[in-house]
Amino acid sequence: MVRRGVGTIETVNALVNDNYALIRNVAKYMLNDKGLTNAEFLRASYRRFIRLRPFVSNRSMVKDTYTDYIRYKYRYEDYPKRMAMIGVQCDNQLNRSQVKNSLSFVAKACSFIDESKGTKFEVARDNTMCRQILKNLLTIHYEKTSHTNEKRTPLRHIFQYSFEHMKDINKSTNSQSYSKPASPKSSLILDLYGEFDRDILLLNNLLNMRL
């Protein structure tokens, strides 16, 4: 075991500080889906995502937000409807590559490579970028959840089921059935979250993921 700076402990398997417990070898968290049925694949991939939970953050609130997000993705999300908000048509068939790429992305976000080690520099920076994106995604998910817990709010349905907050962002989508809130604050919130969610979908489309 090696101590790296104040509050940081480095072991063969992980680097632990006040914010993260980052893993060094992510291979055991990857998924070999050979011979698995679709149902088995979904269960196995879900377990892999949940096993990464301790490495997302040392803060219980962040870990709980991560678990809530993964649960929503697997149990409730209408992904084709969500993608349609950016004009991308896809069916509801299981795309294993998207799930595996998403798992790899989260694993990178939870892994550590010393940026000072020559050829590993770009890989380390890639991992850092994944970690920053995941952090932002979970922050936005937490904030949206906070808004949906308020009384008399329709935002839960908008954020998780209708995705109407992205309609004004994507001008090609007809938004006649959607009236933005009269409150400037609520309208701004919807615009900000709509822009972020749209960017995540564009990233998914670019990297063949399903975040």
Curated annotation (Swiss-Prot):
It comes from the Eukaryota. Keywords: Sporulation. The keyword Nucleotide-binding does not apply. InterPro entries: Irc19. GO terms for biological process: ascospore formation; double-strand break repair; mitotic recombination. The keyword Nucleus does not apply. Involved in sporulation and maintenance of the mitochondrial DNA. Is probably involved in a pathway contributing to genomic integrity. Belongs to the IRC19 family. This is Increased recombination centers protein 19. It comes from Candida glabrata (strain ATCC 2001 / BCRC 20586 / JCM 3761 / NBRC 0622 / NRRL Y-65 / CBS 138). The lineage of its organism: Eukaryota, Fungi, Dikarya, Ascomycota, Saccharomycotina.
